[in-house]
């Protein structure tokens, strides 16, 4: 076990939008340390979003992330030899992390040709409260609602 809790690293805002949330999704998109490629993908997706919605891409993105953020999640708790899925509230930082991760995961699973289009369409779908990432949030909430009886086992 570690002696002290690991400190949270500060995330610097990105150079174009001067926003830390944009930097965080760039870091989620990034593979093998190729940050420049991840930035090109996201900024290209933002251009597509601006063309399709005629709105500021940053506001669309922030609303999309807000629509995907889960309030509750299930944690497995072992009590007297049996496992229970206990619904717990998600901390604010983890809410954002899960939302960004789900947007990128479900963007990857889409059928569009380029990653730019996939990310753009997933963000637009999340903005409109449709799409796979919003469905994932709804499924998580349904599971938490179904296991509400075990909520008293929180720790």
From Swiss-Prot:
GO molecular function annotations of the record: mRNA binding; rRNA binding; structural constituent of ribosome; tRNA binding
Domain of life of the native organism: Bacteria
Alphabetical list of InterPro entries matching this protein: Ribosomal_uS7, Ribosomal_uS7_bac/org-type, Ribosomal_uS7_CS, Ribosomal_uS7_dom, Ribosomal_uS7_dom_sf
Keywords, ordered alphabetically: Ribonucleoprotein, Ribosomal protein, RNA-binding, rRNA-binding, tRNA-binding
Gene3D superfamilies, A to Z: Ribosomal protein S7 domain
UniProt entry tagged with the keyword Heme: no
Family: Belongs to the universal ribosomal protein uS7 family.
UniProt-listed PANTHER family: RIBOSOMAL PROTEIN S7 (PTHR11205)
Official protein name in the record: Small ribosomal subunit protein uS7
Organism phylogeny: Bacteria, Bacillati, Mycoplasmatota, Mycoplasmoidales, Mycoplasmoidaceae
Gene (name only): rpsG
């Amino acid at each position: 076990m570690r002696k002290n809790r690991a400190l949270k690293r500060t995330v610097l805002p990105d150079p174009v939008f001067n926003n830390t949330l944009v930097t965080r999704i760039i870091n989620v998109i990034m593979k093998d340390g190729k940050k420049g490629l991840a930035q090109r993908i996201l900024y290209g997706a933002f251009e597509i979003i601006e063309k399709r919605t005629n709105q500021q891409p940053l506001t669309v993105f922030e609303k999309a992330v807000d629509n995907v953020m889960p309030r509750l999640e299930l944690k497995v708790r072992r009590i007297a030899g049996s496992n229970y899925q206990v619904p717990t509230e998600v901390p604010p930082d983890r809410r954002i992390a899960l939302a960004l991760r789900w947007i990128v995961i479900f963007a990857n699973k889409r059928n569009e040709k380029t990653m730019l289009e996939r990310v753009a369409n997933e963000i637009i779908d999340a903005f409109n409260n449709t799409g796979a990432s919003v469905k994932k949030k709804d499924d998580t909430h349904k599971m938490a609602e179904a296991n509400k009886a075990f909520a008293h086992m929180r720790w």
